[in-house]
């Protein structure tokens, strides 16, 4: 636990080739053979269960360099944001068969630029983590140490709280709000709803979409915010009934997929009945489980907002 915390960027650098290897095997074997093979291995030796919703590897270094190279005239204070991409979104990109083309970090950057924001990344963000991983493994001291390290980096990046901080994963933001008290912290739905509404022109679609409200959003009292944001983008928002917690529970959906499947057993029939082909949420791991058990792709609500908005022209 302590070793992983102290060598976090190296751990992610090990994980990326594993994801790439799995994706290459998927490309060569196809979804059916790959699913059967890994299911057998999961039952035999306990390796994580692979599904076609598993992501490809991702590294945000290229988008960071692009922002530095393209940085133009600095924006006023009210148009600056510190963006901390969560560990999972720094490591995991899109699934091979995702309907989207850009990984979430790239899409978040694109949307913020559309709204006229200057983006500040915290220094050495590849080493940073909110600590949720260690907290879930029963290592609170390590978790709090990582949270303190993150707080120091975010205070520096935000010039002691002058700018809001955006994290793209709702469970991470939930823990950050409990451990970091000096900063204004947001996940994508609340940030967009609060700060970007007047900077974007919304053009809602009539296409039906599914919305999953994560447990962390409910705990933070933000279920209404993400629902209202979805309704700015679509005139046909469907929130499935009797589908509460998705059951993915951090990384347990990889090691105990049957819990995820049971929690979402009532999802797919409702999706099929409504003829919906895309769903939105704001937690990458939840979206992996939702995609696996619904028969449709679930992605971040950031993609929906970007798809349904134009830059608002100044009058």
Q: What are these regions, as identified by a protein language model?
A:
Residues 1-315:
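Iron-sulfur cluster-binding electron-transfer modules in prokaryotic oxidoreductases
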């Amino acid at each position: 636990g302590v070793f992983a915390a102290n060598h976090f960027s190296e751990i992610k650098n090990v994980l990326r080739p594993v994801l790439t290897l799995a994706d290459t095997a998927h490309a060569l074997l196809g979804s059916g053979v790959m699913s059967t093979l890994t299911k057998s291995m999961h039952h035999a030796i306990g390796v994580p269960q692979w599904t076609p919703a598993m992501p490809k590897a991702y590294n945000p270094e290229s988008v960071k360099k692009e922002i530095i190279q393209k940085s133009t005239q600095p924006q006023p204070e009210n148009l600056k944001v510190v963006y901390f991409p969560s560990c999972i979104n720094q490591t995991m990109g899109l699934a091979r068969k995702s309907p989207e083309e850009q990984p979430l970090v790239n899409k978040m950057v694109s949307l913020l630029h559309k709204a006229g924001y200057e983006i500040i990344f915290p220094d050495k963000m590849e080493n940073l983590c909110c600590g949720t991983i260690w907290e879930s493994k029963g290592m609170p001291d390590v978790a709090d140490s990582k949270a303190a390290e993150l707080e120091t980096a975010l205070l520096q990046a935000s010039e002691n709280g002058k700018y809001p901080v955006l994290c793209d994963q709702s469970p991470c933001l939930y823990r950050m709000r409990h451990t970091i008290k000096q900063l204004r912290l947001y996940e994508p739905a609340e940030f967009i709803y609060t700060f970007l509404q007047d900077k974007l022109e919304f053009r809602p679609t009539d296409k039906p979409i599914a919305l999953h409200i994560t447990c962390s959003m409910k705990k933070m009292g933000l279920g209404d915010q993400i629902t209202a944001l979805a309704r700015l983008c679509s005139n046909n928002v469907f929130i499935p009934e009797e589908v509460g917690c998705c059951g993915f529970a951090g990384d347990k959906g990889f090691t105990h997929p049957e819990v995820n499947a049971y929690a979402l057993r009532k999802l797919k029939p409702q999706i099929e009945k409504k003829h919906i082909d895309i769903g939105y949420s704001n937690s990458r791991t939840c979206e992996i489980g939702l995609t696996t058990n619904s028969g449709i792709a679930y992605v971040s609500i950031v993609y929906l907002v970007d798809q349904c908005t134009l830059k608002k022209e100044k009058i």
